[in-house]
Amino acid sequence: VDTQPKHIGVLRAYATRHGAGPLPTEDAQLIAQLPDPHNGSGPWQGPFRVGHFDAVLARYALEVVAHAQATASPTDVRFTSASARGIDSLIITCLDRLAGQTSLQLADGYIDQSGVLHRTLPLPPTSETTTQAAAQQTHFLQQLRPHYRALQSFSEPGLPAAAQAYLAAISEELGVQVAAVSLGRTAQEKRALSVGT
């Protein structure tokens, strides 16, 4: 029996954000098609925004976690067993919300003003304050446009082949296995996945 803790990342099947700040894959059509009654606009958090799955931002999050693990104390049990990617596996939520979309795409990179494709975002230097780093990253992101990878849409409930291909694309882009998926709001709609599913 494996008694080591596992580090599991949880992401929606599409990008979301509250309030101001960069959301490179934001799409007004998705906002209209994927309303979230539990995440409306608020005076302190601003509007709830929606975009296509952003593999670049997800990779950045994995790098931040991996960096935290690499710089943690050897006795810090939070980071004793995670993979080099920062987590051992992923759970993707809200996949059912994408059923019936006329097209599916995910951002696999960003294109800068010179036409250069960036597949990752650099971690800020440790000499900068959090505020400085955030300002630089925001400025950098505002100069870019997403590069999209088109995927086949699906309308059937559950895990039809196109939904499985969408999960496989996320796994491929991030280099992390998708171990489970949420296909609805109830516990019965959560599904563990075997490798290759």
Report each predicted region and the residues it spans.
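Non-transmembrane, aqueous-exposed alpha-helical and coiled segments at domain scale
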Residues: 1-197
